[in-house]
Regions:
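N-terminal Rossmann-like NAD(P)+-binding domain of SDR-like oxidoreductases, especially those catalyzing
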Residues: 1-138
Length: 138
């Protein structure tokens, strides 16, 4: 969804030197596949919008899958971006990374200050880990 919107915007602005892959074309959970892609394409800019997402039922019944898959996607792409000298990486977070009862509007300093919404906690934790990995590489 977000990745498709980014692609549409780039095309509208007449950018032509880019490559996108669907999850069917590139499994971002596979570290070797991600590194092979980066070695072949040598991207300068990376937009990390990919994630395993679902509704409340899926989030509650497949908690380990959401955590594992999203951690793998994030760590593989962020590490490859670092390893292959990507100029800029845009990592998309989510409002669910903030505490369930956070005051609105959300502020960056609210991160990790209280409990997360239980139904999407694994997804949120993977997003937070991605943010912290980006901060660490920066």
């Amino acid at each position: 969804m977000v990745g498709s919107a980014i692609e549409r915007k780039l095309r509208q602005e007449w950018f032509t030197n880019f490559c996108f892959r669907t999850s069917a074309e590139l499994d971002l959970r596979n570290q070797k596949a991600v590194e092979d892609f980066f070695a072949l394409e040598e991207p300068e800019y990376v937009f990390l919008a990919a994630a395993k997402v679902g509704g409340i039922l899926a989030n509650n019944t497949s908690r380990a899958d959401f955590l594992y898959d999203n951690l793998a996607i994030n760590t593989n792409v962020i590490h490859a971006s670092y390893k292959f000298w990507v100029k800029k990486l845009l990592f998309l977070g989510s409002s669910c990374i903030y505490p369930k009862m956070a005051t609105q509007p959300l502020r960056e300093e609210y991160l990790l200050t209280w409990l997360l919404e239980q139904t999407n906690e694994p997804y949120a934790i993977a997003k937070i880990a991605g943010i912290k990995l980006c901060e660490s590489y920066r």
